[in-house]
Swiss-Prot record:
Belongs to the HAUS2 family. It is found in: Cytoplasm, Cytoskeleton, Microtubule organizing center, Centrosome; Cytoplasm, Cytoskeleton, Spindle. Keywords: Cell cycle, Cell division, Coiled coil, Cytoplasm, Cytoskeleton, Microtubule, Mitosis. One of its GO terms (biological process) is centrosome cycle. This is HAUS augmin-like complex subunit 2. Component of the HAUS augmin-like complex. The complex interacts with the gamma-tubulin ring complex and this interaction is required for spindle assembly. Interacts with EML3 (phosphorylated at 'Thr-882'). InterPro entries: HAUS2 (IPR028346), HAUS2_metazoa (IPR026242). The gene is Haus2. GO terms for cellular component: centrosome; cytoplasm; HAUS complex; mitotic spindle microtubule; spindle microtubule. Contributes to mitotic spindle assembly, maintenance of centrosome integrity and completion of cytokinesis as part of the HAUS augmin-like complex.
């Protein structure tokens, strides 16, 4: 095999080339891996792709804005439709006519309002009599509960304070309940102790009488342990 000409740049190999040949010969890397690494796109291609993505996102945002405008136009199309505008104009015209009639009869209406309405029967059709009765029942119920409603409205700003007071009262009630339970247990124990003492006294008197008859000094009276602990506690 002829030696490579060191003066020929085409036949000379660099250190990187020699290293890659050594890696391929040793099996650490393959030619396919080297080919894939050669085909990687340069960084400028990624910049161009990023610019394309930004342009596409801007276009999507613009399309979304146009879509929202179309939806808004569709929703408001019924309001500005000629038929709806005609109805509104008719309502305004009828209101205007009513106001003109009120202004024409202003003096008569004022005199009627100044005149008292006591002891006068208002004309009411028979069809609406039952509704009037029901309305009167509702009015009576409302008047009866009116003061309660007023108190509720007045106390509504102080609702938090009332809740705190209620919580404190409940806590105190729990403490009192616990103390009452302890007191009840102590009373039951005291009753049991009194029962034991009442049963023991006749027996003690009998023994004392018997010892007295035999001229023997009686021992000190025996009290149960529970009675001694209760006396010390007192």
């Amino acid at each position: 095999m002829a030696a490579a000409n060191p003066w020929d740049p085409a036949s000379s190999q660099t250190a990187a080339g020699l290293l890659l040949n050594h890696l391929v010969a040793s099996g650490i890397v393959t030619k396919e891996m080297l080919d894939v690494s050669k085909k990687m796109a340069p960084c400028f291609v990624n910049f161009s792709r990023l610019q394309q993505i930004s342009d596409i996102q801007a276009e999507i945002y613009q399309n979304n804005l146009e879509l929202e405008l179309l939806k808004l136009e569709k929703d408001t199309a019924d309001l500005i439709h000629p038929s709806h505008l005609i109805e509104k104009c008719d309502v305004l015209q009828s209101m205007n006519n009513h106001l003109e009639a009120v202004l024409k009869e202003k003096h008569a209406i004022r005199q009627r309002l100044l005149r008292p309405m006591c002891q006068e029967n208002l004309p009411l059709e028979a069809v609406y009599h039952r509704y009037v009765v029901h309305m009167l029942d509702l009015a009576v119920t409302f008047i009866e509960k009116f003061e309660t409603h007023l108190e509720t409205v007045k106390n509504s700003p102080h609702l938090d304070a009332n809740l705190k007071q209620m919580s404190k009262a409940l806590a105190k009630m729990d403490i009192l309940v616990n103390k009452t339970e302890e007191l009840a247990e102590n009373i039951l124990k005291w009753r049991e102790l009194q029962t034991e003492i009442s049963l023991y006294i006749p027996k003690m008197l009998t023994e004392e009488r018997h010892l007295h008859e035999l001229d023997i000094v009686p021992p000190l009276p025996f009290f149960p342990k529970a009675h001694t602990e209760t006396s010390r506690a007192k």
